Amino acid sequence: CTQQYEYHYDPKSDDEITLKAKANHRDSSQAARVGTNVHNALEHWRKPDADGKTGKLTFDRLMEYYEKENSISEVDFQFYEDGERMLTRWFDRRGRQPVRIIDTERGFGTHRSPYKLSNGTPVFGFIDAILEHRDGTIELLDYKTQRADITQAEADNSIQAGIYLAVAREWWPEKKIKFSFDLLRYGVVSTTWSDEKIDSFKDWLKTQYEWISKIEKGNPTIGDGCKWCAFADLCPKAQELMQKGAWDLLDPTMGEDLDEMLTELATIKASKQMLDRRQRSIDAHLKNNVFD
């Protein structure tokens, strides 16, 4: 969303500056804080030393890092427990697997000094963990503590995956590479792209960069992240949805009551049938009375 980008990186009004500061306040970012604490604990736990070796990867050691992170960036008890449960589940399922860790939290460029792909497109970010498997495959991991799951189709078409794979292909041109969303609440969703797909993505990304570079004013785009956007109170699109009573349609379904979801689904289906009938009626009227 170019509007959110403008609000965040180039706030102009007092309201924009205030909302940006509010988003960073502890009471507004408990879920984000526990996510960061979980990420940091995994990063330090897996971090190799100068010789490329890691310490003993035990659960107790992982929890020591988690507790240390919470002493630096504290969260309420319920969020602390949520992070603890995620790490426990993650360790039982994936933490015991032997794997060579190349690096953790490896950066490529910054907002002010981005990494430039071979076609000149600037990108920046951090790769949570880089692993090397026995067959030589390089795996790029991105930890996710979000409540929404990620489908295989979403991973196969992820812009984040594309950027990371494009960078990794330039770092390891002869290696097999894959990207994985490591969803701490669910499991791992991996995607492998051919060199042709990576090259095509880089070409597309360059067109997006050139388009964004020409934008003089942000344009709001409605999407899944709107419910958590700090600037919804200023966003004209969000305000329009609120006034029409459609804002709640952006709510995710994860964790909702099953009966409520079934009731909502029945309502949606009934409404869809009525709208379909209305559409057919209008189409017939226009065909018989206007276009004949």
Where are these regions (language model features)?
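A non-catalytic, helix-rich entry segment at domain boundaries
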Residues: R26-S28, R33, N37-P114
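Non-catalytic protein-protein interaction segments used by genome-maintenance enzymes to assemble
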Residues: D103-A161
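Metal-dependent nuclease catalytic regions and adjoining charged, substrate-binding loops involved
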Residues: N70, N119, T151-D156, L165-A270, ...
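Hydrophobic/aromatic-lined pockets within catalytic cores
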Residues: P11, E43-A50, F91-D92, L131, ...
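Short acidic (Asp/Glu) and glycine-rich catalytic loops that position anionic groups and cofactors
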Residues: Y9-A21, N40, L141-T145, S180-V189, ...
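C-terminal, charged and often intrinsically disordered regions of DNA end-processing helicases
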Residues: C1-A31
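Short, hydrophobic/amphipathic alpha-helical patches that form generic packing surfaces
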Residues: Q3-Y9, T36-K47, L262-K269
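Short amphipathic alpha-helical face segments that pack within enzyme cores
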Residues: N37-N40, I159-V167
